[in-house]
Amino acid sequence: FPPATGILAAFRQRKKQRFAFGRETLLQHLLFHAGTKEESRENALSTLSVHMKWPENFTRQVCRSLLKDGYITERNGLLLPTEQGKAHNLFYRENVRA
């Protein structure tokens, strides 16, 4: 199989897509619950994989990536969207998902 179109390339592409979608989904989840009475339960780092129904390892990878990019911050065990994260989410909703 040619490297750019083979089975391994398709697998890598699918994995990248799944991760990118996970980032957007988690950011949207955090924004949805930010400032609500459910925030302490829904945005808690300790229970996030349960709420998202994701494997723990995948949840950690997505969180690390969003933290590294400055889209979220961690405070007292809660993940909170930053202004940069809010702006990114708005851009994504207006331009990518349209």
Where are these regions (language model features)?
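Short amphipathic alpha-helical interaction segments
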Residues: M52-K68
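Extended, hydrophobic interaction surfaces within ordered domains
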Residues: F1-P2, Q61, T73
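A short, conserved structural fragment
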Residues: L67-G77
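Short amphipathic alpha-helical interface segments
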Residues: Q17-W54
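Long, low-complexity, charged/polar intrinsically disordered regions in eukaryotic proteins
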Residues: F1-Q17
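Short, amphipathic alpha-helical interaction segments positioned at domain boundaries
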Residues: E83-A98
